């Protein structure tokens, strides 16, 4: 994991929660140095487009953790409005996906690098994005604010194993979930 972003003098990611529906969190992730902004799990395009515009941020990427509509429903509208590239799990049907992600792949936002970790349980193809140097993890619906995500496609054993993986992250990693 090496030297973290702050020690390298690298600008830290600016992460903003954008509430949607009754209990979703859509995440705007901005890199000041490059000017690039990603949206994590945009179930609805309007709130993230509005928030990004107010901040003067240009959305260049969409990162989906799984296929559920409350996490992908805004993909096409964001892509149409911004030209953003959409990345999501290879094993799932992600609307508008340009890049299929599997275990060990990477996503990049400026100089920030996130590794893709497959975390089946909530859905079979569910992924998490872990930015080791930034001490940030986007876990989608693997973890909710008050416990683990519901089991729709995976097994309790898979979910438990992935809870252990998340629990094994360094203590200072900030976890960003979808609900």
Outline where the language-model segments fall.
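Divalent metal-coordination and catalytic microenvironments
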Residues: 29, 41, 66, 78, ...
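Active-site HxH/HxHxD metal-binding segment of metal-dependent hydrolases
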Residues: 21-23, 37, 44-118, 135
